[in-house]
Amino acid sequence: MSTSLFEIQGTNKDVLIVTFGGCMSKVGRIPPFEFLNTLTKWFPDFDKKFYIDLHQCWYHKGIQGISTNIAETKTYLEGIINGYKKVLFIGNSAGGYAAILFGSLLHVQSVLAFVPQTILSNTNLEIKYRNLKNIMNTTTKYYLYGDTTVKNIHDHHHVSHIENVRNFQNVQAIYKDGISLQEMRDSGELQTVIVNILDQPAFP
């Protein structure tokens, strides 16, 4: 198995939760196994996968051991999600970018992203994927969390990244005065958010 993938299988093959790690391969400050164990505690019956970008390049160089670019990753994930009735992509920061990107390309049911980057200025990256506004679709439900305490507009976590894509009717922008996924997890807020998303009707 690739060191870029961690997974826990459930018994319910209707629902798949896919998480994309961000900076230092974590979701916020939560390590992969810890986040997967939390999801398993909340949703023991569902299949769960956690991908890591060891290249730390917004997944543009692929997932090590699996793919080498965005197109290959899309094809790979297309096979992974096939057969599930509900698919949720989750990510934070660069992982949020990946959740939106691949969730859009694959038209998954839902994307949950915390302080995601939606515009990338790095000119070494494939140009058509630098602005997610040009990639997002009209069928996926996007739940995007912005942190209003980040004041520097050049910061990767500035709310301007949410503003860039919030005009889509299928985007729900949620603004918080500080975002800590650890605190959201420990308070039960994160579980409630995910439960409410998964309670939405499946695509026909």
Task: Map each language-model feature to its residues.
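Glycine-rich nucleophile elbow surrounding the catalytic serine of serine-hydrolase chemistry
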Residues: 91-103
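The feature captures the conserved acid-bearing segment of alpha/beta-hydrolase catalytic domains
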Residues: 121-204
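Alpha/beta-hydrolase fold nucleophile elbow
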Residues: 83-93
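Short, surface-exposed basic-aromatic patches at helix termini and helix-loop junctions that form
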Residues: 79, 102-109, 162-165
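Short, surface-exposed "cap/lid" segments of acyl-processing enzymes
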Residues: 1-46, 55-57, 144
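A conserved short beta-strand
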Residues: 107-122
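Alpha/beta-hydrolase active-site loop
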Residues: 62-82
